[in-house]
Amino acid sequence: MSVADVKKGVEQKMQRSIEAFKNDLAKIRTGRAHTGLLDHVQVDYYGSMVPISQVANLTLVDARTIGVQPWEKNMVAKVEKAIREADLGLNPATSGDLIRVPMPALTEERRRELTKVVKSEGETAKVAIRNLRRDANEALKKLVKDKEISEDDERRASDDVQKLTDKHVAEVDKLVQTKEAEIMTV
């Protein structure tokens, strides 16, 4: 294993941490409608649970309403039930074969709770990134111990890993700020 392998590996893992954090943020409901909110809803489709996107077309009707149009008429009731039971605080209404999912307005208290959740998720992501930095630094120390690289190379590589860490932590902070602003916008 070389210094380049360590740096490349840690950067890829940090990027995956950022992607996982973005996915976690997407699950947090803001006052605005977006189809990604229903990505994790599972529907009973002939005995097996499948994501809602595999049995219905998801569209935005307006800024506060998601339209869900199941491809099969017999799925309308099942899809509506799945959305209602998804624990997202949503109350779908069916008109014909279109299910409208209005986004309820968030109360001030609920907005504050959600910003706390966002901050907490952000801290978790930053801890994961710092743990990756620690693992990379340990791998570099092992390379020095095994006499594969010099201490100067290790120090330079450590500085590079620190720069990567700072960059990814700053990205998490930026994502947290953006999501908080989105939540607090009435």
Swiss-Prot record:
Q: In its keyword annotation, does this UniProt entry include Repeat?
A: no
> Where located?
Cytoplasm
One example GO MF annotation: ribosomal large subunit binding
| Keyword annotations | Cytoplasm, Protein biosynthesis
- Does the record carry Protein biosynthesis as a key word? yes
- Spell out the GO cellular component terms annotated for this protein, sorted alphabetically and separated by semicolons: cytosol
One example of a Gene Ontology biological process annotation: cytoplasmic translational termination
The record's InterPro entries line, in alphabetical order, gives: Ribosome_recyc_fac, Ribosome_recyc_fac_dom, RRF_sf
Q: Which domain of life is it from?
A: Bacteria
Q: Which SUPFAM superfamilies match?
A: Ribosome recycling factor, RRF (SSF55194)
CDD domains, per this entry?
RRF
PANTHER family cross-referenced by the UniProt entry: MITOCHONDRIAL RIBOSOME RECYCLING FACTOR PSEUDO 1, RIBOSOME RECYCLING FACTOR
As for family, the record states:
Belongs to the RRF family.
Q: So what does this one do?
A: Responsible for the release of ribosomes from messenger RNA at the termination of protein biosynthesis. May increase the efficiency of translation by recycling ribosomes from one round of translation to another.
What name goes with this protein? Ribosome-recycling factor
Query: Encoded by which gene?
Result: frr
